[in-house]
């Protein structure tokens, strides 16, 4: 029997179901949404709109479809029948004090949020479930093997070959999500664009450069990046800015939300190949960045995360404002800590009006403090939030 790994978002979803009539859970395909809501709400009826029979019923006769499901229901992949949202609104309006009525999941954030804002604003709690965090899988094993296989639950639960599993994942994503979100005649061109983006994870976003390399218009490149964001493939990290300087970069950085997917798209076929790959530093940085996003998403909280880059090309990988105050974080994939890694942090910290905490997250195993900078091993990222 497979061991089910508990998800950190679970308690928050249960809390929301006691407070709101509708709970919406978004996130990428195969991040574990269905498994989670089924385990948390076993007494709810369940229907999956990926099933063409159910989807046709929901589209043709939504009133009858909802009527036969009862007052407690989980509807999976709700974006496949978006007209249901207005009918769900009517049912919620009939019993506004009934909480946990509908548990909805979806993997296309753009359409879902548009539908919720139009039909269910104020009635819905919204959370995002990303693939496993490092703490959810118990800290991981070898660094490069962990990053190479990525964090999608099925790869862990079923011991799947990452390259094979992620090739199927990509094909499904292109056929189901991309075709639905945009009129792309040539999916091979979009796949080329996706691979080009993978090679730029952790870099400043340059849509014009991407467009030129892919042979598409700049406007198309921006549209496709928005599609990748809406379907939880990538995320943009905004720049930190303040009135203290007009010379700060205003360009976001782009990160993939799973390192295994990056490795697959780049043709990295083993952990050993990743360990010596020229983009291993960017992939490690991608891992750390997604861990921060997962920390906040798993607690139902909005994150306050930026990158810093000034006119002198000085950079800080991550600026985070949390309950413990502001922290500045450098990210290094090396396994042996070096004091100079913290020097940029100390120089730039003077820009900030308070006294931020300084950290280097690195690829080693020893937690130590050097010259006022704490060096945090990759397995211990969660300790930054304690």
What is the predicted role of each segment?
Residues 1-14:
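N-terminal pre-Walker A segment at the start of P-loop NTPase domains
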Residues 33:
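Conserved lysine of the Walker
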Residues 36:
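Hydrophobic positions on the alpha1 helix immediately C-terminal to the Walker A/P-loop
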Residues 74, 101-107, 128:
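Structural recognition of the conserved hydrophobic beta-strand(s) that form the central parallel beta-sheet
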Residues 85-104, 118:
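Conserved catalytic/switch belt of AAA+ P-loop NTPases
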Residues 110-125, 141:
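Short regulatory helix/loop adjacent to the ATP-binding pocket of P-loop NTPases
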Residues 160, 164-326:
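Accessory nucleic acid-recognition modules appended to NTPase machines
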Residues 364-386:
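Domain-level recognition of nuclease-like catalytic cores that cleave nucleotide substrates
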